[in-house]
Amino acid sequence: MSSGKIVQVIGPVVDVEFSLDQSLPDINNALVVYKNGEAKQKVVLEVALELGDGVIRSIAMESTDGLQRGMEVIDTGKSISVPVGKDTLGRVFNVLGDTIDLEAPFPADAERSGIHKKAPAFDELSTSNEILETGIKVIDLLAPYLKGGKVGLFGGAGVGKTVLIQELIHNIAQEHGGISVFTGVGERTREGNDLYYEMKDSGVIEKTAMVFGQMNEPPGARMRVALTGLTIAEYFRDVEGQDVLLFIDNIFRFTQAGSEVSALLGRMPSAVGYQPTLATEMGQLQERITSTKKGSITSIQAIYVPADDYTDPAPATAFAHLDATTNLERKLTEQGIYPAVDPLASSSSALAPEIVGEEHYEVATEVQHILQRYRELQDIIAILGMDELSDDEKVLVGRARRVQFFLSQNFNVAEQFTGQPGSYVPVAETVRGFKEILEGKHDNLPEEAFRSVGKIEDAIEKAKQLNY
């Protein structure tokens, strides 16, 4: 193993000089610096650039506090490697694969795998037309998720992306019992902490591995932590032959960290200040998140939309890789409709009669049609009032409002805030409920009875409680 010396430290960027008679470390190799010569006080760097004359530029995965010029740097000869396998379930890791959950130390002889890999070859890929039931009505009806597919949850600040991800983890773990990998990329540490203890209390943690590189960490860690989580998921897919769920919260922070690293490396910025390699970095991550003949990875990714601008390069680049998009809309949160999923903007390649069935497809398209017509009539209602509408239009508006409210429901993970028990609604019940509303079977019930309920029977029961 070759060794060099630190010649410059600029925040998270460390320049290291190797003597010319040694071979330079490869790009993406992990380098280690021992502060005060102690193994416990090590800092891991990743090679990013070769500057010439035996000098390389690296990005630190941890704080560079305490590093000085002249300190020895050792080339490990390989990329950052993290623990994989069944022992990772129930544990919490950082970007380097070190446990951070205060439980018993992780076995030193555990199998490890490098975080930099090639995407599966074209002939290894597999596709599936099987629907993944989430128990969330608006998703299952209008933008269903495919097993082994890629889903993006798009939304601005505070519209409910993380809560929706937490509910999906809860529902899929409770109902399907599959293995999950949760990757927190540049999000709030408090949310990660809450999620860990909630999963521990519900027993879901036993089938989940968690990886965090949160807001307070250097950009190198935030950029690479998504690869750490993906590496753990890939092992379950390729070696164990499992169907894995990979949750990433938040893909935008991955892009943001890449932008910071790019600026630190002195690259010329591209549109809106993003890194020129944005599409390449996103492609390298997303192409590895796929299903093969051995197993599948179904990924659900929260994607923050800066200033609610969907044309921003970060969310726009992610769009191209997704099978389904769930768009969260701020106007719906203002109306108290949760989850605030926009039923007209959300889409899925799985909403086709040959995949979901004729009845489901017809009900979904009719729901979209009635909501679109209601949206067109809203201007007339706002200016002239309901009295100017024809009788047919009044009936349509009434049903559309019932449909809009029925698309909302209480979440299990939000019970501590709302005081209302959450509901899991099977797809068949969802389709039946909306079909009955569209047929006018519940035109006599007040609109408010449909807000935040589960099955259609819950709406009928709520109407009785409203003394209707």
Swiss-Prot record:
Topology in membrane: Peripheral membrane protein
MF terms in GO: ATP binding; ATP hydrolysis activity; proton-transporting ATP synthase activity, rotational mechanism
Compartment(s) where it occurs, according to its Swiss-Prot or TrEMBL record: Cell membrane
Superkingdom, natural source: Bacteria
Cell inner membrane among keywords: no
SMART domains: AAA
Cross-referenced PROSITE patterns: ATPASE_ALPHA_BETA (PS00152)
Keyword line: ATP synthesis, ATP-binding, Cell membrane, CF(1), Hydrogen ion transport, Ion transport, Membrane, Nucleotide-binding, Translocase, Transport
Binding site for ATP: G155, G156, A157, G158, V159, G160, K161, T162
Classification via Gene3D superfamilies: 2.40.10.170, Bovine Mitochondrial F1-atpase, Atp Synthase Beta Chain, Chain D, domain 3 (1.10.1140.10), P-loop containing nucleotide triphosphate hydrolases (3.40.50.300)
Entry EC number(s): 7.1.2.2
Keyword check for Cell division: no
InterPro entries: AAA+_ATPase (IPR003593), ATP-synt_VA_C (IPR055190), ATP_synth_F1_bsu (IPR005722), ATPase_a/bsu_AS (IPR020003), ATPase_alpha/beta_chains (IPR050053), ATPase_F1/V1/A1_a/bsu_N (IPR004100), ATPase_F1/V1/A1_a/bsu_N_sf (IPR036121), ATPase_F1/V1/A1_a/bsu_nucl-bd (IPR000194)
Reaction(s) this enzyme catalyzes, per UniProt: ATP + H2O + 4 H(+)(in) = ADP + phosphate + 5 H(+)(out)
Annotated Gene Ontology cellular component terms: plasma membrane; proton-transporting ATP synthase complex
Main location: membrane
Quaternary structure annotation from Swiss-Prot or TrEMBL: F-type ATPases have 2 components, CF(1) - the catalytic core - and CF(0) - the membrane proton channel. CF(1) has five subunits: alpha(3), beta(3), gamma(1), delta(1), epsilon(1). CF(0) has three main subunits: a(1), b(2) and c(9-12). The alpha and beta chains form an alternating ring which encloses part of the gamma chain. CF(1) is attached to CF(0) by a central stalk formed by the gamma and epsilon chains, while a peripheral stalk is formed by the delta and b chains.
Family indicated by similarity: Belongs to the ATPase alpha/beta chains family.
Record function comment: Produces ATP from ADP in the presence of a proton gradient across the membrane. The catalytic sites are hosted primarily by the beta subunits.
Protein name per UniProt: ATP synthase subunit beta
Species assigned in the record: Enterococcus faecalis (strain ATCC 700802 / V583)
Gene responsible for this protein: atpD
